Amino acid sequence: MTPWFLYLIRTADNKLYTGITTDVERRYQQHQSGKGAKALRGKGELTLAFSAPVGDRSLALRAEYRVKQLTKRQKERLVAEGAGFAELLSSLQTPKVKSD
């Protein structure tokens, strides 16, 4: 199983874009060349601010949604310190309950 990653890209106007991928470098290059998300086209210089492995696609999608709900200040703390990322991931991992 290919691991999925959560990443944040900083635009020239200091905004943070959140996404998921199986190959961070490839996806970053796509964004830089204008072939990635429309939200990043024409935003000037892009820098990869943060990336971390999150597990499978399902967990990556949930992590992406949760990070997109964070305030700018919380995202900046995540970028600077990785603050709270482990807790965020563990809160998303729900144990599978076997039903009888």
From Swiss-Prot:
Boundaries of every GIY-YIG domain copy: 2-77
Q: Which domain of life is it from?
A: Bacteria
One Pfam annotation reads GIY-YIG
**SMART domains per record:** GIYc
Q: Which family does it belong to?
A: Belongs to the UPF0213 family.
Matching entries from PANTHER family are given as:
UPF0213 PROTEIN YHBQ
- Protein name, as recorded: UPF0213 protein YhbQ
Q: What organism does this protein naturally occur in? A: Escherichia coli O17:K52:H18 (strain UMN026 / ExPEC)
